[in-house]
Amino acid sequence: MAAKAIQYNIKVDLHEVKDLSFREAAGEKEIVPNPYIEVTVNGVTKTTIQKTQVVSATFNTSFNFTAYLTPDEFARSYVEVAVLHKYMLIGGVGLQSAVIGKYVFSFAYVYTKSQHWIYRQWVTLRNLDQPQDETGLLLITVGVFGPGDAMPVVDETVCVVNEGERTSTDVNVKLTHYSLSVNIFKGQDIPSVAGQFSTVLEPYVKVKHGGAELQTRPLPDSNPDWLASISIPACVPCFDGNVLVELWNGQDSSTAAGTLMGTVVLDYFQLIKNDLPPRWFNFYWRPPAEGLLGAVTDMMASAELREPIAYGGRILLSASAAKVQTPLPLGVRSARPIPDPATQECVWWLDLYEMTSATGYTSELRIEIAFGPHVIKTASLEANALGTYVIGDNLGRLPEMKIFAPVDEVQVWDVMMYVCSPPATTVAAGIADISNWFSGWGGSPTATQNTPEPAETPWTRLAWVRIPYDSRQFQNGKPQWYSLRSLDGSGTDMFSVLLGMEMFPTKAGKQRAPRLEYKLARFYFRALIYEGLHLPAVGYDVFPDPYIQVELASKTLRTSTIRQTLNPSYYEAYEIEIRLPENISLAPDINVEVISESNSLLSSDVVLGSVQYPIQKVPKEWTKAPVWLQLHSKAYPRCKARVLVAFELVPAEKAEDDTYPFYDDIRPSTKEGNIRLFLVGVRLFKPITQPFVTVCFGRDVENTAEPLWSQESSAPRTGEGGNWNFLEEFTVSVSLPKRMQHHSFLEVKIQDRTQGIGGESNVDVGMAYITLNPLLPWLDSRERAESLETFRLQMLEEVLIEDAENARRSADGGLAARTGGGSFDEDATKKKEMLAAERSRKMAIPYNDPDMANLKIEEVDDYVSFKVAPRPQASRLSREGTSRDERGKAPGKSLSGMPGPVARASPGAGEETEKKGDPVAEKKEGGAQAAPPVAPSAHQREALAASPEEETYGFTPEQLNFVLADLEEDDAEEMTRDEVPYELEADFTVDDLPYLRTPIFRPTDAGVPETVGYLKYVCRVFQSTDEDEGAEMDAVCKSLIETYNSTRDLVVRAYVLAARGLVPPSGASDIQTYVWIQDSENAATLPGGLSYNIRDTGYTKKQGFKPEFNRCYTLACSLPENSIVQIAVMNMGRLTDECIGRTYLDVEDRFFNKKVEQMVIEESTPIELRTLKNEGSTVSHGSLRGFFEIMRADYAQLHPPYTLASAEPDEYQLRVVIWRVKAVPLDDNSSISLFVRTIYQLEDSSEIVKDTDTHYNSTDGTAVYNWRMVFDVLIPAQIPVLKLQIWNYALLSSTEPIGEANFDLTADFFRARKRQQHYRVPRMWVRCSHPAHKGKLRGTIEIEASILPREEAEYTPVGNGRDEPNRDPFLPAVTTNRTYIDWQQIGETVGAASSAIMSGLKWTGVWMTVAGIIALVIFVMFLLK
């Protein structure tokens, strides 16, 4: 069956581009581009902002896409990323764009990766029109996530450059070039396509890989000879593992679109290892419906109606990937003809024995069997008196067919078998013939030789099955039953055919064996139907009305219908006489279907699931326990439904003489049991007004919609919204099964009384099942544990997560198989690098890293140590200054108020933790010191916690002659806080709570129910009514009532740190997020400032899909009214706000959980990751990171909330000093004029551009500036990168950059913000590069910087350039090379020339010159007189 379309979320994070190289055509000069990035997924394109005249740029932009794809569509889908150049006019007016380079990620390849994503990967951009050029690098993250896949959250500090590496190092992505060649030789048997106005036959082949798409020319022939070789430049590493070969018929036009006949997916990495020799690829398709109405029907068809059902031809192709030094150009070339793959003459024998109909079809039928282009048809078949089509020797033994088939088994066609009904014209003609015969007009007309035979009218195909070719199966000739599925898209199996096939080479000389004797004998078939379990629902809030139908050899048995349940109990036995082959191995298997009965004339029954039981396993007498059979549902593949059944098959004579008697009473043996149910309450995700609960057991035999016993609760004692406490006990004595195989349970219906126009009405809210099997006292512990797992109802969320884990395991297995034979997968290396970076992580931590959001980073030299010193105890700050032990004690009670002492974790005796390593910090180049040892792992932290004496490396203040500032206690606390990558509830066990809980669910159209709340209860089953047996339960119930009476004044603290991987349902990319947290709809503020509902719209974060909140929300809480805390991440819109995702936190469970209570006391509540979900969506919409506490109000008053680092940006001033430039190449010029440009991008994507003055006419590539630049910045910053560029100032020609570098200030910003004081970036040289001169130094810039809080900067201002105030540091004036015309140099040149002239003259010439000058003076004086 064709799978349904599945929702996928695609995340693309664009981090950075580097070394862009753009030229309009090959051989032309490179130009500095104006880059921007386009990302296209499934026809949807999203674009980043444009940068101006840069070859490297930081984007830090995220895009989300949502797609609904079938597996075939998923295999063909990809993410296409294109970096483009925007042509600009003077004044910033944009013109057309040109491609700089592209990259493609196929969905299938990304999904095979761990966690279904590729994280921060440098890829080489390529322009396939100029494959020899490497047009730049792109740092990108791509993820493809399906149902149940969690959004990955990583420690981003691993991937951030460390101190001493502020400028991004050269990225060396070494490409190995390949020439991918796909040779398309010819096609055969390609059918024409019936269009709306004409029939189209223009087949061609299209090849796609790595963003390239080429095709052969279309040829109007069903057997075209293309002889085309498609060449695509390819490389490794590559993230498009697919080479798609598509067979199309008809070109796209204004009136019609081309028809995709089929797709072949070649493995690119396998082609690198081994060439694909010429071979046939067979295509199968579903012919489109004819006419305009048919076209519309095809567009709206379900996946079932798009599944291929017919042979669509084949193509002969070969493929290879040859390593080359330089990539070859893209193109389609001629290919030499080659001989066809080897074939052999084969003999095909077919024997049909019987056909049965599961739908009671008894009209005239015919069977057609197609083997590629070869088709064989039976004569028309008539049903016998038993309603089956027994095919005798004359019609069943089909004539021998000789076929030339490929020797290679994988190239042989599959077998397609159809059941067809006669066309209407044939039926009418048959009626006319019968009428003529009766009226005397009949007779056999004599056909003349000149009368042409009329063309056969095709019969209508009703059902089909595709049988993959298997030489072992096709050579044994053993008959098998095949189920044929309906062609109407319903997915039901209409017919079953017993067919024997045999195929072997003619040269084998094998003689056809006699046809198996097919005689029917009488049997009595008995079906024992017990129960159904976890059947799928038939829609939202619609329970099924299931009955079970058993079919064998066209005989059908049907049980009664049990109304409105997922767990029906039947206990019905049926016996029927049936005729089966004497050779029982030829009999069909038993088909069991569970069907929901329709209640309307306008709808039909719905098949919930089916299973086949082998007839050969059925005994004459079933003596063992009945078996649970797993149902397979085509409409509900995620539902794990089962049926409990048994079967017997007795020869007629053995049944009729009572050798094997039939018993119709199959009810299980029982024991009397007393059920006590203490209903604590209901916890719903949505509010209701007047809830009540009905507890039911069993079903009435006469009216299965009514329970055998039921009792309605009284009004709830306390509660509001969706949380209500009943604290009421229900007692009933019933008969319960002895054996664990039979399911025994209570049904609990939750309803709400509402007032409407018509009066009072009851609205169904949800249903809960309480399984009694684990509570039965006569079962042993193993049976209880097994029955608990067997009868546990899986919710939609659990099923999705389990499916995702299975897919991950399969993907990991496939990945291991793929990487086992080659070295093209870089995951292993990348993981090693990330682990190594994690182990050696230094203190250069980004400000926006959630793991380090509340840490204070001190200078490394503060931790230099030469001996081991005792580590001080860290605890939360207390306003009263009480000790940790004092604060851990609540007056008379624990935090939850339950009786008993507060549990304390005693240190393990005799356990010591040794810390090994060199305590002396090593010096690095540039004066930077090595980082302190990395933080211990979770396992190490446990060992440290259990150690009686904790040790750390560092001086004690007494050992120093100065004051050592220790870490703040708040920060030290956060450093030791554990983190779990899941929701904390996953660690809760049944024994952690004083009550049990089961999901309250509602049916969904996926078949699997979804959770709408929880039912909390205490339940016991007793064999007697002895009061001593119930003493334990009485004590538990009494304790719960007392505790709830004292839980009116509680406090919930929700520390919401950050959100990651947000996926807005609207697909918006520019989002402003805030937190909405509530445990009640009541938004009023209580005395003392607490509230039940906080919509934090005044604290919006415009940080994209990774906002930092670092907010502590304190909510008032009373149990049970406020048991469920809803935390939603909202996107603030212009008109309405959008809920991105929400998570529900059951604080009541945490209040009663002793382990969680101890965590609060010990201040060790771990940070957890909670999945954000949205109603109507089955995929994750992101993750919320935080930790959560619940406590009594008096305890909260003694223990203030933790102080979290603010996530609001602070105003700072960045002061950058450009000292000098050196090593700038002259590029064949005698001199060069240089200036330095700095670019800083603000939050609104605008840029601050500042230039130094110009150093003119440098003859050695050096320049001096002593120039200060001042930037007002916000920390945290979205892009904390300062771009440095060296420019050539040209008076006549255009000014252009010589080299550039990105100066990453992430770690410096983080440190400056943590210190809240003046922070200096040491003086250093920054190397510059240019993509047009790969691997060459294009100059270095000597730079120094400092970062100050805005208040301090205003107190100690400095001037730009060398303006006053000129301080910190003082910048000396520069006077040389500051004018374009150097007059001093000109004077020196003239003087030198004069000296040269004078030294060459003789004394005679000198005296003559002097005399001439004197005569000239006298002449001037004479004139003046």
From Swiss-Prot:
Q: What is the documented disruption phenotype for this protein?
A: Attempts to generate conditional knockouts failed.
**Could you tell me the Gene Ontology terms of the biological process aspect for this record?**
plasma membrane organization; regulated exocytosis; vesicle fusion to plasma membrane
The record ties this protein, via InterPro entries, to: C2_dom, C2_domain_sf, C2E_Ferlin, FerIin_dom, Ferlin
Coiled-coil annotated spans? none
The reported result of mutating residue 605 to A is: Affects microneme trafficking
Sequence ranges of Basic and acidic residues compositional bias = 877-889, 912-926
Which keywords has UniProt assigned to this entry? Cytoplasm, Endosome, Exocytosis, Golgi apparatus, Membrane, Repeat, Transmembrane, Transmembrane helix
Where would you find the membrane-spanning parts of this chain?
1404-1424
Q: Where is this region: Disordered?
A: 871-952
Superkingdom assignment: Eukaryota
Would the keyword Transmembrane turn up in this protein's UniProt record? yes
Q: Which Gene3D superfamilies match?
A: C2 domain
Reply yes or no: does the keyword Transmembrane apply.
yes
Site positions for Putative Ca(2+)-binding residue? 541, 545, 605
Q: How does it sit in the membrane?
A: Single-pass membrane protein
One of the record's GO cellular component terms:
trans-Golgi network membrane
The listed locations are: Golgi apparatus, trans-Golgi network membrane; Endosome membrane; Cytoplasm
One short Pfam name that applies is C2
Q: Which family does it belong to?
A: Belongs to the ferlin family.
Q: What does this protein do?
A: Plays a role in microneme replenishment, probably at the vesicular trafficking level. Directs microneme organelle traffic differentially based on microneme population. Regulates microneme secretion: facilitates microneme membrane fusion with the plasma membrane.
Extra facts:
Overexpression causes parasite lethality.
This protein is called what? Ferlin 1
Originating organism: Toxoplasma gondii
